[in-house]
Amino acid sequence: MAASYGAHEIMEIHEVLTDAIDGINQFQLYRPHARDPQLLQILDRQTQFIVNEYNALVNMVQQHGAGQAVPYRAPRQFQPVYGLDHPAPAAPNTSAQQMDDRDVASGMLGCHKASALMKMVAALECGNPEIRRALQQGAVNCAEMAYEVWQYMNERGYYQVPTMKEITTNTVVNMYQPAAAPMAQPSAGETANFQ
């Protein structure tokens, strides 16, 4: 009987599924510390999405690729605020009772960033095309959820975006120029004709 999955594939899937369980548990731990109704909506929506995505991946792996990944759709977009405006000092809390909305959102953001990396690395080790696509979509979903949380944090001043002087930004951006179209290279057979 032929193997259904490669060793690397199974180990990466194991890591991704364990990470999903940990993320779901982590979000449930955060919930009592969130106070802002908007953050609670984001937390609940994302937790439900992660649970559904986890169940779909488990089913897909057990059915050897049957199923389809679903993209995460954040309900809104906004214009980011750039620059620093008296950022609050940051330090670890001395007890869990001190956790606030900023801590919850920051923890969610870190979870999504780490999961996006893990899922993309797992996709690169995956031989099964359906599971590979599901892991790739999972990485994109994490990036979308991270951006939704980041928007919330940026809007509230929890995650401010430092900027550089405009001349520095323009210098770096304009340093790169479009590439010229590559010249067609003769193939090995064509080179022999020139000799």
What would you call each of these model-derived segments?
Residues 37-82, 146-156:
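Conserved alpha-helical segments that form or flank metal/cofactor-binding pockets of metalloenzymes
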Residues 9-31, 85-137, 193-195:
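Acidic/histidine-rich alpha-helical segments that form the ligand environment
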Residues 4-11, 15-62, 124-125:
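Acidic, metal/ion-handling microdomains and their immediate structural contexts
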Residues 63-107, 162-182:
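Carboxylate-rich helix-loop segments that flank metal/cofactor sites and access channels
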